[in-house]
Amino acid sequence: MSFNNTDIAAFKDVWVFCEQRQGKLMPTDFELISEGRKLADELGVDLCGLLLGENVEGLAKELGGYGADKIYVCDHPLLKNYTTDGYTAAICQVIEELKPEVMLFGASNIGRDLGPRCAARLHTGLCADCTHLDVDMPIYKDFLREASTLAPEKIDGMNSAMVLGEKHDVSRDLKMTRPAFGGHLMATIICPRFRPAMATV
């Protein structure tokens, strides 16, 4: 069976790649778990960590104490030290099987190497060096009426599906914000047609 990354409804959960070096977690792991927790709570899904290495079960327990709902571990002697090909193959195999909706990598040397390779292999999008992450979630017209500077008749005409007090379905897309044009502009990027949406942070 081939991997279908366009069946958006088949994907769920927010995942964080947890980087370890010589049996020690990196400080960015905890920052990513914190950011992933916010996204997972907003989406109403689990936050999962993905840890690769050899004899890293103890690190998995440590990560669980920082807010991850689940930790997936790929434990093998060949994963003891980082290699681009080995880690890419292992991560892509797990993603193809378990289908996370969002996948976050740290903006470290390893994350910047690994994230784009996984995205290319899985034929999905990745936004590098994000400074802010958010989720495009259902909104309510009554909230718009209170918070918007638009006239009420403009709100009423925005979308026939937006009935007062009822949800308006939107995409649940990960909104990834990053500097563009030499830092003179902040661009928000989405990956609307493929999953998982990937980012380095």
Regions found by a protein language model. Give the residues of each.
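N-terminal glycine-rich FAD/FM-binding segment characteristic of electron-transfer flavoproteins
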Residues: M1-V201
